[in-house]
Amino acid sequence: MSSYGGGYQRESRGDSYRGGHDTGYQNGNGYSGGYSGGGGYGGGYGGGYGRGGGAAGGDRMSNLGAGLKKQDWDLDSLPKFEKSFYKEHPDVAARSEREVEEFRKKHEMTVQGRNVPRPVENFDEAGFPQYVLSEVKAQGFERPTAIQSQGWPMALSGRDVVGIAETGSGKTLTYCLPAIVHINAQPLLAPGDGPIVLILAPTRELAVQIQAEISKFGKSSRIRNTCVYGGVPKGPQIRDLSRGVEVCIATPGRLIDMLEAGRTNLRRVTYLVLDEADRMLDMGFEPQIRKIVSQIRPDRQTCMWSATWPKEVRQLATDFLNDYIQVNIGSMDLSANHRITQIVEVVSDFEKRDKMIKHLEKIMENRSNKCLIFTGTKRIADEITRFLRQDGWPALSIHGDKQQQERDWVLNEFKTGKSPIMVATDVASRGIDVRDITHVLNYDYPNNSEDYIHRIGRTGRAGAKGTAITFFTTENSKQARDLVTILTEAKQQIDPRLAEMARYSGGGGGHGGYGRWGGRGGRGGGRGRGGTYTASNAAPLGNARRW
């Protein structure tokens, strides 16, 4: 395979190549062994994960990548590869500049860069091959989201792309579908080859969500993938990498572990995605990202996605992308999703539990509702979860000190509605993609307004409406002005005490109590799961069931 010459057809990726093996979810994300033969929630998770290192909450940050050799790239000697696949549909070409401008304005879309392709208005105009198109239509999507309308032509053109859009805007498919087209145009993997597509994500939860999309839409092409993240044993991930995968979705720390150990390499990567780049920088991953990118050929195609566009992310784009084109959906100012009703209550710490219970009573009157509660620390997350469970509410918590199999189980219980209340720290604020969350409750206000936007963005997704309830104390008064600005922009009601705080840094106080819930027989709560869960999630439900 001396040349990366163009024109490789999907049919060439046939049975002789893959033998029908698709890794899908078989790489240690918590489901492949966990639910089989375990008799419910107990046996399945008991073994195989004991050495996961989940107590550290994720990837090590110290001196990662020191063992990676600096690459000296000679572009003339590198094999050629295909990356430009976009052919403008006649209907797109026929639209006037004014029509294009009106479409972008209607969808709050701005573009920057040289020769940005026009947006598409339906799936057929995107120019995807039939095997991709049929997968999309089989999922029941009616039309592209705003980011997809503009992002697909950009990514398919082979250009480097920056996309700025709110969480829940459909950005994952915006880069996943072009990635599938890109893979199918490349030569088949040879033994010892690393992935063709590398997707870097800040959290394990987000990495697993991305893998689900890739698995769904890459099935017909038999594209193999693996998810590489910390907090679980390396064995299944190493096996996937050694067998060969076209797509690797990874958190930076664990990927560097694999590279340093020689378990994979990035020599074949020609399509690089940095998802939630702002969050990766917030979490301190910049040195690791730079080390990883140094191992990838510089003429690759790079797509960077972010919810915000601070100067640190702009610098990353300048360093990693060449002649990039950019699409922004919505205002570039810090703003909240306008489909979310924001309720901010000025309270004291003593009032929080009582007010939380009163809100939950109202929220859980509708049995299909789901509420995500954010706390400022892992300790408070566990305390609140224990308090709620003892009072009869089927709440579970998720944070970085819980081992991966427990986090996966909690997330699944929440997704399926078996436990419709989940308590989380900010580790979950971007990594969790549960589309039908109806309510977010900020028990503790986050450290900055960006995290507030991302937290409440867990609700009101995919065109739905949502409600965000926030407890704000005098300790948060320094952030009152920013919060009032966000509320004003979204035309929300503002508590007079919050407005006063924004001007003078004032605040108020009160007292605690309990509430009611309502009984869902046969659930069993935190009991009978083999003792593999942390104390807060294993706390028995109180006798007065609330749901």
UniProtKB/Swiss-Prot annotation:
Key word Cell membrane present: no
Motif position, Q motif: 121-149
The keyword Transmembrane is annotated on this UniProt entry: no
Segments carrying motif DEAD box: 275-278
Bias (Gly residues) ranges: 509-531
RNA-binding RGG-box, as annotated region: 504-529
Residues binding ATP, per UniProt: 165-172
CDD domains in alphabetical order: SF2_C_DEAD (cd18787)
One Gene Ontology MF term: ATP hydrolysis activity
UniProt comment concerning the protein's domains: The Q motif is unique to and characteristic of the DEAD box family of RNA helicases and controls ATP binding and hydrolysis.
Protein name in UniProt: ATP-dependent RNA helicase dbp2
Source organism: Aspergillus fumigatus (strain ATCC MYA-4609 / CBS 101355 / FGSC A1100 / Af293)
Gene from which this protein is expressed: dbp2
